[in-house]
């Protein structure tokens, strides 16, 4: 179990989890606020 927790704390695994979380967050923000980068409300 110690080797498994060491594996989970390595940089590629943490990066994959972080980027997956960030991608999901951006997808959900874009779902609720579509075209937020176009500034069509100005």
From Swiss-Prot:
Which InterPro entries does this UniProt record tie to the protein? PSI_PsaJ (IPR002615), PSI_PsaJ_sf (IPR036062)
Task: Tell me where the transmembrane regions lie.
Answer: 7-27
Mind telling me which GO cellular component terms the entry cites?
A: chloroplast thylakoid membrane; photosystem I
Bilayer topology reads: Single-pass membrane protein
Intracellular or extracellular location(s)? Plastid, Chloroplast thylakoid membrane
A family per Pfam = PSI_PsaJ
Query: In its UniProt record, which GO terms are filed under biological process?
Result: photosynthesis
Enumerate the UniProt keywords alphabetically.
Answer: Chloroplast, Membrane, Photosynthesis, Photosystem I, Plastid, Thylakoid, Transmembrane, Transmembrane helix
Q: What does this protein do?
A: May help in the organization of the PsaE and PsaF subunits.
Report the sequence similarity comment from the record: Belongs to the PsaJ family.
Q: What is this protein called?
A: Photosystem I reaction center subunit IX
């Amino acid at each position: 179990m110690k080797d498994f927790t060491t594996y989970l704390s390595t940089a590629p695994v943490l990066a994959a989890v972080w980027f997956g979380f960030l991608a999901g967050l951006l997808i959900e923000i874009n779902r609720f606020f579509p075209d937020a980068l176009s500034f069509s409300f100005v």
